[in-house]
Amino acid sequence: MVSLLTMPMSGGIKTWPQAQIDLGFRPIKRQPKVIKCTVQIDVTELTKKRQLFTPRTTATPPQHNPLRLNIFQKAAAIAIDAAERALISHEQDSPLPKTADPRVQIAGNYSPVPESSVRRNLTVEGTIPDCIDGVYIRNGANPMFEPTAGHHLFDGDGMVHAVKITNGSASYACRFTKTERLVQEKRLGRPVFPKAIGELHGHSGIARLMLFYARGLCGLINNQNGVGVANAGLVYFNNRLLAMSEDDLPYQLKITQTGDLQTVGRYDFDGQLKSAMIAHPKLDPVTKELHALSYDVVKKPYLKYFRFSPDGVKSPELEIPLETPTMIHDFAITENFVVIPDQQVVFKLGEMISGKSPVVFDGEKVSRLGIMPKDATEASQIIWVNSPETFCFHLWNAWESPETEEIVVIGSCMSPADSIFNERDESLRSVLSEIRINLRTRKTTRRSLLVNEDVNLEIGMVNRNRLGRKTRFAFLAIAYPWPKVSGFAKVDLCTGEMKKYIYGGEKYGGEPFFLPGNSGNGEENEDDGYIFCHVHDEETKTSELQIINAVNLKLEATIKLPSRVPYGFHGTFVDSNELVDQL
């Protein structure tokens, strides 16, 4: 999505560490109300619980280094700033939906924290397995500045949390990914880019786009080097650690010998990548190729596919014809094919004219799945199969079943499909499902994989050494009470049997990350490995990293972290050999 500048209210801008001391959200002057949502937070109570937003440490406020402006630019800046102040004042008279209200979206342990330099010799309860040697890193959204208007959880600046483990000891650090937008905002000392989901809706969203383009034309900002936040995915590929969000190119990070994090910069694969890349590229464990998609919400082609050889050489882009720009957050690969979801959550920028969100559920569109050879050169090679009621924000795996002429896809089917982005009366459901695509009849079937269980399973993974091949186990977060995660489930995809690991008490977490053990590469020992989970205790306000044996779900070790770790998104593990080979 495109971005725009935002202006402060009078009285100055505060960075998050300053603003969290005073979070009644004074810039958002709305009447207290109870927001009808699954989170069930009374907004009048949030101002009484200011400690939920207060970090345990403080950060140094960003330095304010204003640009050198000519007379024309100064006049333009004054006029645009005045228009933005008027816009913000107007917005304060209108209620925000829960999906864009920062008092809901970044309350409690969803609120941001400052950076932390390396903290060594952390307390470890239990014993860290000897085979674990490297760095577990996890990405997440962490807004540097207090929102001046709407804000969605996905809008926050990218922050990566790193736990380095060596010889049974652990260290911790967390750092912002220094994206182009964050660097500009930090230099100016205030937010100047918009929130793609929280702010770009309705007439005010159109106004923000106009202000954004005006600032760019006047040279008040540089919007030519990307507007992404790099807050979602992580992948280690071709000796590079990449942080990603689907609104921009990846950003290359580097883990130092001490376990700290550095931003190398926006990475275009040595000039080969010209467009954004989604946050869930697929690394084939056998061929070592990286497969990716890129979607555009404004102009055709709305979707493109490409892949990178193990040494980072990009294939020609294959344009995939779609009738409307579609949100494609994830996809899947098999040994020989790519599975492309063309689903019902689409972008209709014209909806902003009627005061609505441009991210909409199109009930008239029929969802479908595209099966395409990995080495396809023409869109005519794609087999499209209709697949109603199969909206999956994430696909966990897929494989080929030659005996039945089918492609088997494992994903969590969500309904209502757009409930993450738009306010809905229905409660969200995320059902772990098996979708079978018959390549001969060109029909699909879907069934729930759980036996006599009604539980929301979302963020998670399978053994990545088996990606694209038949897998037996999936490790998925138990999203209860939504949107919190009270534990994770180990699901047998063959039998539907589910075993739960619950954090207990007021402890909640996020993605269960599976790290294969010494023998966790083959089909027989697929679950040999360990689960990493960042866990936060909402009663004691402390965070920890739990390491659980994936075979028997027994807790092996708990690493006590020196500061709060907000609930976040996706992670990966960089082993000691990969650390040495980093570029």
UniProtKB/Swiss-Prot annotation:
Q: What is its EC number?
A: 1.13.11.51
Which Gene Ontology terms describe the biological processes this protein takes part in?
A: abscisic acid biosynthetic process
Subcellular locations according to the entry: Plastid, Chloroplast stroma
Please list the cofactors this protein needs.
Fe(2+)
> Major place of localization?
plastid
Q: Name one GO cellular component term.
A: chloroplast stroma
Molecular function terms from GO: 9-cis-epoxycarotenoid dioxygenase activity; metal ion binding
Q: Which UniProt keywords apply?
A: Abscisic acid biosynthesis, Chloroplast, Dioxygenase, Iron, Metal-binding, Oxidoreductase, Plastid, Transit peptide
Q: In which tissues is it expressed?
A: Very low in all tissues. Expressed at the point of organ attachment and the abscission zones in the plant.
Which EC class heads this enzyme's classification? oxidoreductase
Catalytic activity, reaction form: a 9-cis-epoxycarotenoid + O2 = a 12'-apo-carotenal + 2-cis,4-trans-xanthoxin; 9-cis-violaxanthin + O2 = (3S,5R,6S)-5,6-epoxy-3-hydroxy-5,6-dihydro-12'-apo-beta-caroten-12'-al + 2-cis,4-trans-xanthoxin; 9'-cis-neoxanthin + O2 = (3S,5R,6R)-3,5-dihydroxy-6,7-didehydro-5,6-dihydro-12'-apo-beta-caroten-12'-al + 2-cis,4-trans-xanthoxin
Source organism, top-level taxon: Eukaryota
The UniProt induction remark is: Low induction by drought stress.
Which free-text remark accompanies the cofactor? Answer: Binds 1 Fe(2+) ion per subunit.
Query: Which residues make up the binding site for Fe cation?
Result: H280, H329, H394, H570
Can you tell me which family this protein belongs to? Belongs to the carotenoid oxygenase family.
Protein role: Has a 11,12(11',12') 9-cis epoxycarotenoid cleavage activity. Catalyzes the first step of abscisic-acid biosynthesis from carotenoids.
Name of protein: 9-cis-epoxycarotenoid dioxygenase NCED2, chloroplastic
